[in-house]
Regions:
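Conserved alpha-helical scaffold segments that buttress catalytic/binding sites
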Residues: 2-248
């Protein structure tokens, strides 16, 4: 899988530090020498790229993320984006939508997040409303699934209900993880898939390094199970991992 570091932040000052997480993740990955099946991992073979951004110029940063993401979708079979905060997912998601439209494929997005990120949009997308802006930019709302919600603002609840956005709460997920994974895979069946994962889907006991931790999340083992199931989806085109903040 091709890996792209996207050190973009627009958390209104609340996510400063997330721009460094891509390098921190790669550094940690290079210290892993085998997986739990005993297979050797050669980190020197990682296929890496970074989109160089100036976070003081949000409009330019978003254009660069979009342009580079679209090129990646057109040239790579599968890609992992390392944020950055969740604002990057607007530009990568918009590029994914345009790629699918040009290739006559049906786009699908599954978002793992404790928050809905559907507040009223600002001029440039932030980590609090990127998904709503993406929907209002044309991403088919019936093809979006929000998984793991456990702290949602009233305005967001109204938006989700009015637009009939499909959701699976954290209670749904933890009560029967295997069955919910089956539901998730069925939702993605036959569609080109983008998976966006906010690290706060995890319980802060397992992943404290994020700006908006929410108790009652998933364990690291549960997240690994999710990822292992999701990567088997043949139409999986892209994933992102966002909101890790090494300063926390």
């Amino acid at each position: 899988m091709f890996i792209v570091k996207v050190p973009g932040i627009n958390g209104l000052g609340k996510t400063k530090g997330c721009e460094k997480s891509g390098n921190a993740i790669i550094k940690a990955l290079r210290e892993i020498h085998s997986n739990e099946q005993g297979n050797i991992i050669d980190s020197s073979l990682l296929d890496l790229e970074e989109i160089h951004l100036d976070n003081s110029n949000l409009e330019l940063s978003n254009r660069l993320i979009y342009k580079n993401s679209l090129e990646t979708f057109n040239t790579k079979p599968r890609v992992l984006f390392l944020g950055g905060d969740h604002s990057i997912s607007y530009s990568t998601g918009k590029a994914f939508l345009d790629y699918c439209n040009s290739e006559k494929k049906e786009p699908c997005m599954i978002v793992f997040d404790s928050h809905a990120d559907c507040m009223p949009p600002m001029r440039e997308p932030t980590h609090e409303e990127w998904l709503r802006k993406l929907i209002e930019s044309g991403f088919p709302k019936e093809n979006i699934l929000l998984v793991g919600l456990r702290n949602v603002w009233k305005e967001e609840i109204n938006f989700l209900r009015e637009n009939k956005i499909k959701t699976l709460s954290i209670a749904n997920l933890t009560n029967d993880l295997q069955d919910m994974c089956d539901t998730i895979m069925e939702f993605a069946n036959g569609r080109e898939l983008y998976v966006s994962m906010d690290i706060d889907i995890a319980d802060p006991v397992f992943a404290p390094a994020t700006g908006y931790p929410e108790s009652g999340g998933l364990s690291s083992r549960q997240i690994l199970y999710l990822i292992q199931r999701i990567k088997k989806i043949k139409t999986l085109k892209a994933m992102d991992l966002v909101e890790i903040n090494e300063k926390k």
